Amino acid sequence: CQDPRGGGHFSGRLTLPIVAAGVVAKKMLADATMLDDAPVTAVQARIVELGGIASCCHSEGGEGVSDGQILQCIQNDNGSEANNENWQAVIDQAIKEGDSLGAIIECTVPDIDPGYGEPFWDSVESLVAHAVFAIPGVRGIEFGDGFQAARMKGSEHNDPIGEDGRPVKNGAGGANGGITNGAPLTFRVAFKPTSSIRKAQQTFN
């Protein structure tokens, strides 16, 4: 039964156990190894867009960019670096207006062996999406080139294969035909703005 005063199973109360489970999983991965006995690099995640403003801090797998740098390093829609605006200012403005912001988080699994997943119903993408959508506020997910692939030609989207047998560009995001291909598994998750805000809105009592 949904409590009319707010909260319920979509509030932060039940997001916390998911976070706790993720912490345990990351600790378990720290002791794991790949097929060639190489250590598994921790799953990485970073904010790539906040309030419609994209980050211009790009490093492979999210390494080498601190949270402070990300907050100060953004770009406008035209791709030019903004000098007088940053994510903190956007956050402060939203708070001042009693509003909230959406965001896009990019997640990368740098070290994952090929062969995980299944074609069709149990593809690695569908299993990841199934888990991700358990997080309240998630409204979308894309892998690799994602929706941008719809604007590409086949020659642009196809992944060239390097001498090591792995994709060079990784436009597929680490999976082909529902099965991991040995490249980093990369996906982005869209979060809606929090619906609980101070700003007056039309409603029905």
Predicted regions and their residues:
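Exposed boundary/loop context
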Residues: 1, 60-61, 72, 147, ...
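Glycine-rich anion/phosphate-binding loop at the beta-strand->alpha-helix junction
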Residues: 98-205
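Glycine-rich, mobile lid/loop segments that gate access to catalytic sites or pores
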Residues: 2-58, 65-120
